[in-house]
Amino acid sequence: MKGVWYRGLSSIDGPIVVAKRREGAFYGEITAIRDRFGALRTGRIIDLSQECCLIQVFGSTLGLSLDGACLEFLDVPMQLRVCEGLMGRVFDGLGRPIDGFPEVLSSQLRNVNGYPINPYARVYPRDFIQTGISAIDGMNTLIRGQKLPIFSGNGLAHNRLAAQIIRQAKILGTDEAFVMVFAGMGIKHDVARFFVSSFEETGVLSKVVMFLSLADAPSIERIITPRCALTAAEYLAFEKNKHVLVIFTDMTNYCEALREVSTTRGEVPGRKGYPGYLYSDLAELYERAGRVKGSSGSVTQIPILTMPNDDISHPIPDLTGYITEGQIVLQRDLSQRGLYPPIGCLPSLSRLMKDGIGEGMTRADHHAVSSQLFASYARVQSVRSLASIVGEEELPALDKCYLRFGDLFEQYFLTQDEHEDRSISQTLDIGWSLLSLLPRTELYRIDPKLIDQYLTASCSAVSDQLRKAIEEARTPVADA
């Protein structure tokens, strides 16, 4: 009961305290805990029985004693104050300001647990989001309202890629700008500083809401952080009709926090020690993306997770892939060769891409060019494997042509500067110019009418450097 303090705890075990259950207590209820010195802590009920309740403390339990602690049940779940003044602010994982400015002045409170969008109320995602990154826009397109994760590995450039997407993302053909919500879970101080500095330098910080749960914060805070971020995103999208792009990093740290709390509670572990409800817990977060009837706003999610040991079959990327609508995969071998962004096009996928590209949305040739680039680059991988066995000199002329195509594809299509913002037309023109290296008979996934319409014009639209590289790489077979 709010306003009533109960003295005494039953036990203290790390961040978990056990207290006698009071009438009306409910799962997820926020509590206040005061030690004998008057210092206040906040906690959250994470388990209930007939006699007692299990409370996860937000912060250290040092200084708490069984007899000297007092407990108040606040009769509310975890809530976040929301208003448009959230934009440009930096908060901790629980929604408390850490940027030196005062608390958000708003009487509007929202339950951070939220609810997934009613399927009947959903609007199917169709609007193309231009990120300015060719490997995404051209071959693994991001659609407004989609949830498209980035599967990365420790030490790869996922932070730089996320910052670039936040700087450059726009909806093609409109002046509507994105509002960004960034949630960092278990990230180091230098990573947090990188994102803040990046947004300040490029002038987008005023359109970004940041929630930072750093590596030295309590585990339970990492579990609350994405829920606070999504609550802010839903308010801005569905009540203020803004297009919101939500970036989560790192979802692996979030899942590790879930495992830690689950172990503390004594739950039966599932795969690799993660709780059996990991799938449903992730779905609670990911399914809060989308568009709804009656609102022009949207929530688009890009969760970033680092795959332990670069293992895409690990439970975290495995379950994430079941819930989300594709994935962008960063590959270590591309990074080691100095390519940025090191996006592996072949293992990457956007399941909603087909519904957001084409005539009237991007360009009439988009689907055909993307499909042909996939097929041709897949052939490159086969030829490279063969060349590693028999040697490049023993390959037929057509296979040598594919090798040259693969090298230039990685150098000019996949690779770009982190401040280079390519339009979709530039991306498709680069794709056409690279495909011109191959014999016309090899462009079997493109309608001949599209080849006649776009090939010559696109080749003349690219940079002089790329045109020169293509001319130098041509073989007699490519001209046949």
Swiss-Prot record:
Signal peptide: none annotated. InterPro entries: ATP-synt_VA_C (IPR055190), ATPase_F1/V1/A1_a/bsu_N (IPR004100), ATPase_F1/V1/A1_a/bsu_nucl-bd (IPR000194), P-loop_NTPase (IPR027417), V-ATPase_su_B/beta (IPR022879). Keywords: ATP synthesis, Hydrogen ion transport, Ion transport, Transport. Transmembrane segments: none annotated. GO terms for biological process: proton motive force-driven plasma membrane ATP synthesis. One of its GO terms (molecular function) is proton-transporting ATPase activity, rotational mechanism. The keyword Ion transport applies. Produces ATP from ADP in the presence of a proton gradient across the membrane. The V-type beta chain is a regulatory subunit. Belongs to the ATPase alpha/beta chains family. This is V-type ATP synthase beta chain 2. The lineage of its organism: Bacteria, Pseudomonadati, Spirochaetota, Spirochaetia, Spirochaetales.
